From Swiss-Prot:
Residues 329-397 are cytoplasmic. Residues 375-390 have a biased composition (Basic and acidic residues). GO terms for cellular component: plasma membrane. It comes from Mus musculus (Mouse). This is P-selectin glycoprotein ligand 1. Changing Y56F: No effect on P-selectin binding. Greatly decreased P-selectin binding and tethering and rolling of cells. Binding of P-selectin completely abolished. The modification Sulfotyrosine is found at Y54.
Length: 397
């Protein structure tokens, strides 16, 4: 047992140490059966992808699955475990590590074997550089002190982290204990949600880095043969991702769209889940807010207008009815209080005049009840005037 491996056991605890001792102590014995293409990728490379090979899809007898499960649950562990385990292998020569992997690798069907092999070749020499620093409890601090090769190492145990939104130097500067925390440190909530599942998928199913390499065959082939090119390409990827992250952080929906689109270049199908979730969330928010309130608002306004019109019509009818009743009542009251007026026809006057005495036919009774004056013979010619006066007096009150 090397001292670095003992330090690994003390850091991870008894449960994790037991799981790690068996697979690393007997690498050749525990991998006799067929292994996934991810392990074939590791055979092409060095010990770098032995840690990512322990995905949920590996065979049940292998104990490496348990190690990967713990790593997926706790993102801090995968970096430390990979570094220490690789340190134990890096204590020997890089060639020795490659030989052990070759013995463990049987041919098995898988995807993206060439890309994984490229990364694994780079990791063997790089882990030998980091063997001294991995003893430190904080894996992120070790990454800060290490040069460009360390960037390649950090991207391999957690490929989604380095390639998606935050490069290895960004994680070192933030000095965050877990890569998941580095993703969640972004102010935009949608970014945290989208970036968090990305590292989980990358750790559980390690074909993500291989797909990234397959999408760009020229730099990946260079990686298989030359280590500095790997570092340069990865630094470019991480710097571009780092520059894209702050620009997309202020807007939540834009970050989800831009990060997912740009990360697909590196991650491939693993990122396809992210834009779907982001778009679904956006769709759930926007249709609920825009059409829903407008429809009920318009439906509410229409009945109100109709009710107002009906009320106005009824009010106008009521006023007309009241006015008509008042007018009719006034007219009826006037008719009842009218007094009859006597109308004297000319025929009646004629009858009265005919009844008056003419000349000396006795002493007629005047209308006032007085006797007419006795007229002398001299006054006979004025008899007509007296008769006229009597007729006039008869009409006077």
């Amino acid at each position: 047992m090397s001292p670095s491996f003992l330090v690994l056991l003390t850091i991870l605890g008894p449960g994790n140490s037991l799981q790690l001792q068996d697979p690393w102590g007997h690498e050749t014995k525990e991998a006799p059966g067929p292994v996934h293409l991810r392990e074939r990728r590791q055979v092409v490379g060095d010990d770098d992808f032995e840690d990512p090979d322990y995905t949920y899809n590996t065979d049940p007898p292998e104990l490496l699955k348990n190690v990967t499960n713990t790593v997926a649950a706790h993102p801090e562990l995968p970096t430390t475990v990979v570094m220490l385990e690789r340190d134990s292998t890096s204590a020997g020569t890089s060639e020795r590590a490659t030989e052990k992997i070759a013995t463990t690798d049987p041919t098995a069907p898988g995807t993206g074997g060439t890309a994984v092999g490229m990364l694994s070749t780079d990791s063997a020499t790089q882990w030998s550089l980091t063997s001294v620093e991995t003893v430190q409890p904080a894996s992120t601090e070790v990454e800060t002190s290490q040069p460009a090769p360390m960037e390649a190492e950090t991207s391999q145990p957690a490929p989604m982290e380095a390639e998606t939104s935050q490069p290895a130097p960004m994680e070192a500067e933030t000095s965050q204990p877990a890569p998941m925390e580095a993703d969640t440190s972004q102010p935009a909530p949608m970014e945290a949600e989208t970036s968090q599942p990305a590292p989980n998928e990358a750790e559980t199913s390690k074909p993500a880095p291989t797909e990234a390499e397959t999408s760009k065959p020229a730099p990946t082939e260079a990686e298989t043969t030359q280590l500095p090119r790997i570092q340069a390409v990865k630094t470019l990827f991480t710097t571009s991702a780092a520059t894209e992250v702050p620009s997309t952080e202020p807007t939540t929906m834009e970050t989800a769209s831009t990060e997912s689109n740009e990360s697909t270049i590196f991650l491939g199908p693993s990122v396809t889940h992210l834009p779907d979730s982001g778009l679904k969330k956006g769709l759930i928010v926007t249709p609920g807010n825009s059409p829903a309130p407008t429809l009920p608002g318009s439906s509410d306004l229409i009945p109100v207008k109709q009710c107002l019109l009906i009320i106005l019509i009824l009010a106008s009818l009521a006023t007309i009815f009241l006015v008509c009743t008042v007018v009719l009542a006034v007219r009826l009251s006037r008719k009842t209080h009218m007094y009859p007026v006597r109308n004297y026809s000319p025929t009646e006057m004629i009858c009265i005049s005919s009844l008056l005495p003419e000349g000396g036919d006795g002493a007629p009774v005047t209308a006032n009840g007085g006797l007419p004056k006795v007229q002398d013979l001299k006054t006979e010619p004025s008899g007509d005037r007296d008769g006229d006066d009597l007729t006039l007096h008869s009409f006077l009150p």
